Amino acid sequence: VLRKDPQIIEELKECIRRHRSTEAAIDELHEKYESANRDIYYGYIVKLFQIIGYDCRLSRGGQNYERADAILFIGGKAVPIEIKSPGEEKELSVKGIRQALENKIILLARNTYPTDRNITSLVVGYNTPNTRSEVHELIEDIFTAYEIKIGVIGFKALLAFALSAVVDERVSGIKDLENLKGVSHA
């Protein structure tokens, strides 16, 4: 049974009602959380994934065996998630990508949750990297060297998927999320 936060669902619905536009609602929520730190942001990201329809869990801080910030399950397989709050960095950098690789390696090595090498390792950040960022090249280099996919989702894209789930009143997930490599655009 998926846990969906009624308070966040109501916040999304109210934002849509107020603006009558998904884009304006996304902009308002993006701005609202622009200074959020990990204590607020990480849980919010997990709850957005739950609204979209995923079994997603926040890792317990300080647990060495749970390196990833959150774990999402698709078809019984674990997808590690590295989360970067806007308080940590406004635009995703190579640090988050390296941590996503580390999350995947540790998950594969320790077998804490069922997964496989072909499933992506995610990074969720406030803003996606610009097109000239080293992030894009690093994602390709990681795939070339290790055949590990790193997927990147920005806060605006995640909000768009969650708003769509709330407006349409159905859960459809994110198409091919488990195979995402590079930056997702809603």
Question: Which residue stretches match the model-derived regions?
Answer:
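Charged, low-complexity intrinsically disordered tails and linkers
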Residues: 1-19
